[in-house]
From Swiss-Prot:
Region (Domain III), start-end ranges: 135-184
Free-text domain note: Has three domains with a flexible linker between the domains II and III and assumes an 'L' shape. Domain III is highly mobile and contacts RuvB.
GO cellular component: cytoplasm; Holliday junction helicase complex; Holliday junction resolvase complex
Quaternary assembly: Homotetramer. Forms an RuvA(8)-RuvB(12)-Holliday junction (HJ) complex. HJ DNA is sandwiched between 2 RuvA tetramers; dsDNA enters through RuvA and exits via RuvB. An RuvB hexamer assembles on each DNA strand where it exits the tetramer. Each RuvB hexamer is contacted by two RuvA subunits (via domain III) on 2 adjacent RuvB subunits; this complex drives branch migration. In the full resolvosome a probable DNA-RuvA(4)-RuvB(12)-RuvC(2) complex forms which resolves the HJ.
UniProt similarity note: Belongs to the RuvA family.
Alphabetical list of Pfam families matching this protein: HHH_5 (PF14520), RuvA_C (PF07499), RuvA_N (PF01330)
CDD domains registered for this protein in UniProt: UBA_RuvA_C (cd14332)
Range of residues in the leader sequence: none
SMART domains: HhH1
Protein name stated in the entry: Holliday junction branch migration complex subunit RuvA
Segments for region (Flexible linker): 135
Cytoplasm found in the keyword field: yes
Amino acid sequence: MIAALRGNIFEKDGGKILLDVNNVIYELNVSMITFSSVNDKGLFYITEIIKENEYTLYGFADKNEKKLFDSLIKLNGVGPKVALAICSTYTPQTFMDIIANHDINALKKIPGIGPKSAKRILMEMGEFEVVFEEQNPVFNQALSALESLGFNKNDIVKALNGIKSDNLEETIKLALKKLSKDIK
């Protein structure tokens, strides 16, 4: 299993990157966000999809984007093509905010997703626990504090998604408000 590839960009074309790793060139399918973020060199976190007669690599410049993609392809009716369209349209944080807010209209803006698919994705993603690596240490401290109060980790992560504060006390208060609304 390939976890990641680091190399020089050999060619970029239409959502695919040819990556030269020690004179072996790999074809990576990438989101438009990853496509536009890389220049001459890159490190890509890899998801391999192996089917009967096909072996495909999906590359992501960001670990959280890979985690989102991996979660999406586990959903009914969401294959790699739709998952990549989601990753091309929204950042992982924005997508999780859409799920937390049940914003069906935002989902319908994604190519390949109609009203039925949007409803199904909202319902099924609500059951998944996707924990992104946060650069903000306040996120982790708030998560621990709320877990010690007995809240479910998945509910806490949903509540913390979208809170943009570097103040621990304020973050916990805002998350508690969201969590208390879910209880009622």
